[in-house]
Amino acid sequence: MLFLVISTPRPDKPSAVVAARRKWWSWMQPLLKSGLARAHYARVGRGAVALFDVDSTATLHRLINEWSEIIPAHYDVYPLLDPASAQKFLAKKGGRT
């Protein structure tokens, strides 16, 4: 299950959260290696974006909670279809169910 997660952190001074931001990058590395995260990017100005590939919403919930422990934020979560699944869906009856 693919999910795009976009964080909007609390409006703290950037200098006050440098250590937490470094910890977040370290926290992401094993997730990338394991495949739970496919990609991650810093947002211009504030925040981050991550693409998670998880087996369940419970796993996603755990990851977002871990992320929140490092950097408290508001999270926008978008479920995604991979390109092959989207094209397969469109090929069936013109995309109708």
What residue ranges belong to the model's regions?
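Conserved, structured core segments of small domains
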Residues: M1-T97
